[in-house]
Amino acid sequence: MKTLVLLSALVLLAFQVQADPIQNTDEETKTEEQPGEEDQAVSISFGGQEGSALHEKSLRGLLCYCRKGHCKRGERVRGTCGIRFLYCCPRR
């Protein structure tokens, strides 16, 4: 009888050990932010000579990014990139 109880306990423990990593992984993905959610940057290129000339004149020497949500500290909004992104450039 003792052997049966011990064997059952070991089997239950083995199942619990296998189930815990799956639960932890699910919980981590729910609570953690998606990688770079706030730091998503999108590269933008302007087509044609006129677009690139205007872009170079107004933003010469600046490194600007399309960010989701809000700009980082030290940056300001210079426009939008599509519907959900802000065009953020360093303050001058």
From Swiss-Prot:
**Keywords on record:** Antibiotic, Antimicrobial, Cytoplasmic vesicle, Defensin, Disulfide bond, Secreted, Signal
The disulfides recorded in the entry are: C64-C89, C66-C81, C71-C88
Q: Where in the cell is it found?
A: Secreted; Cytoplasmic vesicle, Secretory vesicle
- Keyword Transferase recorded: no
Task: Give the SMART domains listed for this entry.
Answer: Defensin_propep, DEFSN
Pro-peptide residues, renumbered to this chain, are: 20-58
SUPFAM superfamilies under this entry? Defensin-like (SSF57392)
- GO MF term set: phospholipid binding
Q: Where is this region: Disordered?
A: 23-42
Function text:
Host-defense peptide that has antimicrobial activity. Exhibits activity against Gram-negative E.coli (in vitro). Probably contributes to the antimicrobial barrier function of the small bowel mucosa.
Spell out the family assignment given in the record's similarity comment: Belongs to the alpha-defensin family.
> What's the protein here called?
Defensin alpha 4
**What organism is listed for this UniProt entry?**
Mus musculus
